[in-house]
Design a protein with these regions (language model features):
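DNA-contacting interfaces and partner/effector-binding or oligomerization modules
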Residues: 1-24
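Compact structured core domains
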Residues: 18-69
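Nucleic acid-binding interface residues in structured DNA/RNA-binding domains
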Residues: 3-10, 64-178
Length: 178
């Protein structure tokens, strides 16, 4: 059973999903890949994980970095999970390029245990920034797993499932212009 709840953010409606214990999805209403973890049987219910997630979002949209993370369970391929773990290391107010994530994955592949370990057999020297972009784009828990902090080469604001304007607004919230 999948449970859902809604959150009204300053940037628009957000849908939350849970398996009853952990957050499994967080999407801006209407974004690309919206509801990718939702099955046919969804029930609206106010669970403790939703209360905690709404508290996290309240702090975040107030312009502060939350000091806790709600419990999350993300379903995906080993490669996607490795990319999503790297996303979680991007600091509040910071950014990382798709190419930098690809390089980090290569380090994990060739150095043994690490974020990319086990995602693909054997060491690799190259990783496609496009492959990384595909995994970033399928991140089921927007904002908390900060895919909006991933930018193109040279800092261009590309490839956010909720659209470039929301990406710009989220980055501006974290790093306001002087």
């Amino acid at each position: 059973m999948v449970f859902i709840s809604h959150y009204d953010s300053p940037l628009g409606g957000i849908t939350l999903a849970s398996d009853g214990e952990a957050l499994t999805g967080l999407w801006f209403d209407g974004q690309k890949h919206y509801g990718s973890t939702l099955g046919r049987d969804c029930q609206e219910k106010d669970l403790p994980v939703f209360v905690e997630t709404r508290q996290w979002l309240d702090i975040y949209f107030s312009g502060w970095e939350p000091d806790f993370t709600p419990p999350m369970r993300m379903e995906g391929t080993p490669f996607q999970k490795a990319v999503w773990e790297i996303l979680r290391t991007i600091p509040y107010g910071g950014t990382m390029t798709y190419g930098e994530i690809a390089a980090k994955l290569c380090e994990g592949y060739s150095d043994g245990p690490g974020p990319g370990a086990g995602a693909r057999p054997g060491p690799t020297r190259r990783m496609s920034a496009q492959a990384v972009g595909g995994a970033v784009g399928h991140n089921p828990i927007s904002i908390i797993v900060p895919c909006h902090r991933v930018v193109g080469a040279g800092g261009s604001l590309t490839g956010y499932a909720a659209g470039p304007e929301k990406k710009k607004q989220l980055l501006s919230l974290e790093y306001p212009a002087p």
